[in-house]
Structure formats: C-alpha cells, structure tokens
Design a protein with these regions (language model features):
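N-terminal, polar/Ser/Thr-rich
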Residues: 1-38, 114-120, 140, 442-447
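Non-catalytic accessory/interaction domains
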Residues: 2, 149-152, 168, 223, ...
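Extended, low-hydrophobicity, Ser/Thr/Pro/Gly-biased non-transmembrane segments
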Residues: 3, 15, 98-206, 232, ...
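Ligand-binding face of N-terminal immunoglobulin V-set domains in extracellular IgSF glycoproteins
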Residues: 38-55
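Solvent-exposed beta-hairpin/edge-strand motifs
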Residues: 50-71, 490, 494-499
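A surface-exposed beta-strand-loop module
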Residues: 57-114, 135-138, 175, 179, ...
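Aromatic/His-enriched, Gly/Pro-containing loop or helix-boundary segments
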Residues: 71-87, 123-131, 281-300
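Hydrophobic alpha-helical and helix-loop surface patches within well-folded domains
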Residues: 182, 211-214, 218-482, 621-634
C-alpha cells in the first residue's frame, strides 16, 4: 500500500518542511486487550509555517488529533498516515490512538508462554515499524528525544532505552497496575527506540567505563528460560567490548545503561536498540553446543554493541547507507573478538569460513549488486538486505582498513564521532575523514569497490632460477565477464617452508596490488618456498589462485600450518579453484581427506565437510564418483 511504502523523495520533502523535531512524549497502556493497545503521543516540532505534511501511524483507530490546540477531524487518518495541514512555525501535536499487537516480530510483538501462560511483549522497529506503536515521523534523519510512560500489570517489568525514573502503582478498576516512567532519551532515530514488557526475569551487573562512569548492565529472559541463560558470559563479552571500543574509538559509550534481552519468536538475530538490545532466544543454549555457536553469539553481542556508536550515536541519513551500518558492526565485532576476547586465535578464521564464504557465493550469482545500492523506498531496503550488505560489505571494509591502515581508520572514526554525534551522515562524511588521516584517494577506492559488483581473481605467477631462488613473482588480477573492474588490494604474501614437521611462515611481504599485473620486486632472490601463500592473513577480498607447487604442498601438509587464518585462505582458494574447474576435483578430495582431521576451527570444519560433500556429488567425474566416495568413506 502506498502509505506504508515511504519513498526517499517523500522523506526528503518532509525533512524540508519539518525543520526540527524536539520531543515525543509517549503513553502506552498495555493492560487491557489481546489485540490492541492505547497509544497517546505529544510531539513538539518546528516546521515551515503554512505548509502541510503527514505523520506515520499504522493504527486500529484514531480517537483524536489536536494540532496547536485545534481539534482536527479523524478523517485525516487513513490507518497508515495522518495528514497535518497548515502547520505553524512551532507545533504541538497530540494524538490518541489504538494500535495493533503483532505476532510477526514487527511493531509490538505479543507472545503467550506455553509453559506458564504469561504474556511477553517486545518491540522491533527497524526498518519502519515504530509507527506501529506510536505516531511518528518515521525516517532516520528526523531525530528527537523520546520519553516513554508505560502502564502494565503490576507483576510486569518494563525495559526501555533509558533508566526508569519511577514506578507508580495504581488501581485502575481492572486490577492492580504500575505505570513506568522513563527518562527522556538523547536525540536519536525512532527505529532504535524500544519497549520490552512482561514478567521477564533479570540478572544485573555493572562496569566502569573509560570516563569513570558506572554503567548498569542487565540480562533479561522469560522466567521459563532464565535457568539456561549464561549471564556471566554475556557480561564478560560486554565488558571486553566496552573496553575495546572505547579505546579504539576514543569516544565514551554514549548511553546511560546497557540491557540485553532474550525475546521469544524474534525474526532477526538481534537488534541494536539504544541501551536495550534484543536477541533471539536461540542464543540461550539449553544443552552443550558446538563452539562455533558460542563464537557466533559472541560476535553478535559485539556486533550490537558496536552499533551503539556507529548507527545509534551517529546514524545514516537514509537507508541507502544501511550496508555501512551493518558492515561496520560486523567488521568491528570480529576485530574486537580477535583483539580482546578468548576467541582471539579463531575470530578471523571463522569470519573467513562463514562471512567471506557467504560473500563470495552471493557475489558470483546473477543476483549480485553493488554494495552501495539505490534505495528508492522502504520496499527496496528488504530487497538489498542480504549477503552483499552484510558479508561482502564487512569483507571489503576489512580490505579498506588494511589499505588505509588501522591506526588511520580509528583516527578518522574519532573525528567522525566528534563531528556528528547525535546527528545523521552520508557515506562521504566518513570518506572525507579517511582521506584526511590516510592521505589516500579513498573516494576513488570507494567508486571501484562500493559502486560495482563482482569479485576479482588474484593469481600467482612465479619462476625460480637453477639455485631454487625466486627470479620473478607477479600477481595477475582478472575479473569475471560482465564485471570489468580491476581494483586496488592490500595483501600479504606468506612464504611457508617445512621445518621440523611444521609448515612454518619464514618470510612475509605486505604490498599494494593494483592493475592487471603487480610485480613483487621484494621477493626476487629469496628461496622459493614450499608454499607461497597469496592473501596470507586474509586481508583482501578476492579469489586466490596458488601456483602448482604450493597446491601440492597444501594437499599434503595444510594441517601442519598452525595459523587457522592461513589454513582458511588455502581452504577457500582451492575450493574456488576446483569450483571454477581450474583444478581436478580429486585433488580437492585429497586435500580434505589428508588435512580435515587436523582442522581446529569448528566453522571451517563444517564448511569443508559441506564442500567435500558437494565435490563428491557434483564435481568428481561420473566414472570416478563411486570409487572416490568409497575412498572418502573409508577415511
């Protein structure tokens, strides 16, 4: 329906009329009905005098509309929008309405726990669903403060973005009730506001941040689920994330508290509501699980925490930069895990086996698209919310951080947060700061990496002299048909040799790769290694082709490399090579059978077993399939 699908042009026009939204005061009565709830709002905003616009409100009914003391006809509401005619320079808008509960994870979701019959509510507003809970100018660049007042049954708790000011008991004629009053939020976008209500149980803790402020921490879950919640693990990861992000960003945590809530029937992994993060209950483990699942939960915890700065403190102007919001959090969460948690040895290997594998697969489909996509309306957001947005975006962001230098990247972020706190930005605002700190042409980099689709291939071309020393080493870059872009890459070449039964890195070369052929002068004269690993450390986003000698070494000795990241690069390279019909499938089978028993990263282990299955069923020549399957089964 047109009223539900806000277009970018409509948002731009409305933002030109609404000069500033000052505040929302929102009253919700969540006691009385299983289908609808009362939602009353008072909004103060400045506007172009005499102009008209609309406010978003997906309602069951509208009881009254009062604009600047004048009662307006409820006919101005059509169930999706409310028209606002003849605005003043300074406006006070009061609306009384009823809204629908949902069971779709949009707006205010209502769940009845089959274990005890208790009712649990939680909000989910990204992308455009705060309008299902209260009338609102539903676009990220119309920020305001939000003050919630919520009436609930007396045995419930209510959690929102800010701490509660008071809880006031009252007998309302239909049983005892409490009204929860919350402090106004800082200026922020409506999609990161939140209300969670019900007989949730909680475990509390606290931390002291870099400013010396005490930040209250909470972990919440349903009563029937709370015995399985590992709150101490959540608190440990949260403390490690706070420490890392505040140190790297040189910007203190911007909110007053940090609550994390496991909510039922959640249709996403998690949501970065400011100071009130929600997670799906799958992250509550009721029995022993694979380490990969625990690591995935850790990355999710750190991902949502990163959003408190990038996304919540500073927010995209429109949804076309949603990719940056998500890619940044995915990159930073892995970096935080690698540098400040118990997952230090495995974080980037897991990223390679999961995120980058997903990205490479998505980027070679006919449905691929540039990371920066045109978002003309809200419907476009869902179409482009995919493996390119998340996985390729994060992979390319890692490449960019390597290209500009991590210190320069973090220095740029410090200025970015200082300049734009509590405001909205576009991609160019970040690129400007990156160019200033790095001295690199980041806009040209952006045009090649963010505005075009497809993945390049980087192939090793190496020769040696009679003494076994490298006489020439080149990196040849190519592209797939239809995606004719050669891109700049920052990469590491690892020189690995067999030493005392281990395949050990004995030399390292870091370089820029650009154009069709990059000559590696630094390698000339070095002893040709047993394994010459292009993209060691996995900084580049590209398919890698190894030389034949390196392939043979990997088939026999991949499991003898200590670094799970280096192993992951080889696993990925040879999988791409066989999948592109550049290497016999039997060699990939040999690689897996010889080395899978030494793989310690559980995500890589799962990925390679899946790839082996695909190879045995699809890539091995039909006449050799039965024999090869028996050989695999016997191992």
């Amino acid at each position: 329906m047109p009223g539900l699908n806000l277009t970018r042009d409509e948002a731009i026009e409305r933002a030109s009329i609404i000069k500033r939204v000052h505040s929302y005061h929102i009253f919700l009565d969540l006691r009385t009905d299983q289908d609808v709830f009362a939602s009353n709002v008072e909004i103060r905003f400045d506007a172009q005098e005499g102009a008209s616009t609309f406010i978003d409100a997906i309602t069951s009914s509208v009881k009254s509309i009062n604009l600047n003391g004048e009662e307006l006809s409820t006919d101005l509401a059509d169930g999706e929008r409310i028209q606002l005619p003849n605005l003043a320079a300074e406006n006070v808008l009061k609306i009384e309405a009823e809204m629908f509960y949902t069971n779709t994870g949009e707006g205010l979701h209502r769940f009845v726990d089959p274990a005890d019959g208790e009712i649990y509510l939680y909000s989910q507003f990204e992308v455009p669903d705060s309008r299902r809970v209260f009338p609102v100018f539903e676009q990220p660049d119309l920020k305001a403060t939000f003050e919630f007042e919520v009436r609930v049954p007396s045995h419930w708790v209510v959690v929102s973005n800010q701490p509660e000011v008071k809880v006031e008991p009252k007998d309302c004629g239909c049983g005892r009730a409490n009204t929860w009053y919350f402090k106004p939020t800082p200026r922020m976008s409506s999609y990161i506001t939140a209300i969670v209500a019900g007989p949730y149980e909680k475990i509390t803790s606290e931390l002291t941040n870099s400013e010396g402020r005490v930040i209250p921490l909470g972990v919440y879950a349903r009563k029937s689920l709370m015995p399985f919640v590992d709150a101490e693990d959540m608190f440990e990861l949260t403390r490690q994330g706070f420490e890392f992000y505040e140190e790297q960003f040189k910007t203190p945590y911007p909110f007053e508290k940090y609550d994390q809530l496991f909510v039922p029937e959640f249709n996403a992994g998690a949501m970065e509501n400011a100071g009130c993060v929600t997670y799906l209950e799958t992250y509550v483990f009721r029995s022993k699980v694979a380490e990969a699942l625990r690591e995935r939960r850790a990355i999710t915890v750190l991902h949502e925490l990163a959003h408190m700065w990038f996304g919540d403190l500073v927010t995209m102007k429109w949804w076309n930069d949603l990719w940056l919001n998500e890619s940044f959090a995915e990159f930073m969460s892995t970096l935080a895990a690698a540098e400040n948690t118990r997952y230090a040895k495995e974080a980037w290997a897991t990223f390679s086996a999961s995120e980058k594998t997903w990205a490479y697969r998505q980027d070679q489909l006919s449905s691929t698209h540039p990371i920066v996509a045109e978002i003309r309306d809200l419907a476009d957001v869902q179409v482009n919310f995919d493996g390119i947005t998340y996985a390729k975006g994060a992979s390319v962001l890692r490449q960019m951080v390597a290209w500009v230098g991590q210190e320069n990247f973090m220095a740029a972020l410090k200025v970015y947060f200082d300049k734009h706190s509590w405001g909205n930005t576009v991609l160019d605002d970040l690129l400007v700061e990156l160019e200033r700190t790095s001295g690199r042409d980041v806009r040209a980099w952006s045009a090649k990496w963010l505005e075009t689709a497809g993945v390049n291939t980087l192939a090793v071309e190496v020769e040696n002299d009679e003494a076994g020393n490298i006489s020439s080493l080149g990196i040849r870059q190519s592209y797939a048909e239809g995606f004719e872009t050669l891109r700049p890459h920052r990469a590491v070449i690892g020189l690995y040799n067999l030493v005392d039964g281990k395949l050990t890195r004995t030399d390292r070369i870091e370089l820029d790769i650009d154009g069709e052929l990059t000559v590696v002068e630094e390698a000339i004269g070095k002893k040709r290694p047993d394994l010459l690993l292009l993209n060691d450390e996995d900084l580049a986003y590209a398919k890698i082709r190894l030389d034949e000698r390196s392939i043979e070494t990997a088939i026999k000795h991949l499991g003898d490399i200590d670094s799970s990241v280096a192993r992951g690069v080889v696993w990925g390279s040879l999988w791409d090579t066989v999948r592109d019909a550049q290497m016999p499938a039997r060699k990939y089978v040999d690689l897996v059978l010889n080395n899978i028993g030494k793989e310690t990263n559980s995500t890589a282990l799962r990925t390679q077993i899946n790839n082996l299955s695909a190879t045995l069923h699809s890539f091995v020549a039909p006449e050799a399939r039965e024999e090869t399957r028996h050989r695999a089964a016997d191992r």
